[in-house]
Amino acid sequence: PLFKHLLDELQGQDVYVDTDSDMIFNDLKNKDVTCYKRNQKFIDLETDGDFKVSPVLLMIENFLDKYVTDENEVIVTPHVTSPFIKLSTMRDAAAYLDVFDSAQACTEHKEFTYFKGQPVNFNPDVVQKTQDLEPVVMGNGAFFIFTKKVFKENNNRVGKNPYFYPITFPESIEIDNDKDWELAERVYEE
């Protein structure tokens, strides 16, 4: 399972697992991680068609209130749907907290990019070389890094002065659909 792949990568770290799966909870009970059952109200919000946003911020707030006493402790939230993210990458990104208040994984794209029909990173009146374009940065859910203090001040994993840490393939694979799953399987098998 994906969660085991990530836990293997995080071996030796202080790891907390929030799950609604009895199988995962029971599998991790006697392991070197703190596993706790997801609050039913968060499960209900995930399936509530009237609740238009993810309850992830509520879940993080619950975790911080329950388990984190030091408001300056660095919190890293890797996601199991990014199975190829490396501990070394997250450590490198966390080093930026000396200058920035948070860090998020991202991918950089040097392509002619439009948003709502308008150019984002180029002048449409000038033919530029693709390699000369300003990269467009897209957030990737592989990880978010912040402190309890930053989260409480912003009610978000991303603070007011974030660093967007670029990751590349295969670490940037994020499994959101069947095609992503198939790609991850192919990469894993190689």
Predicted regions and their residues:
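Short phosphate-binding loop-to-helix
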Residues: 2, 22-76, 84-88, 92
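Short beta-strand scaffold positions
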Residues: 18-19, 145, 175
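A short acidic, often aromatic-flanked loop/helix-cap motif at beta-alpha or helix-coil junctions
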Residues: 41-46, 110-113, 170-173
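Hydrophobic helical membrane-anchoring modules
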Residues: 165-166, 170-190
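Generic beta-sheet signal
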Residues: 18, 38, 78, 105-106
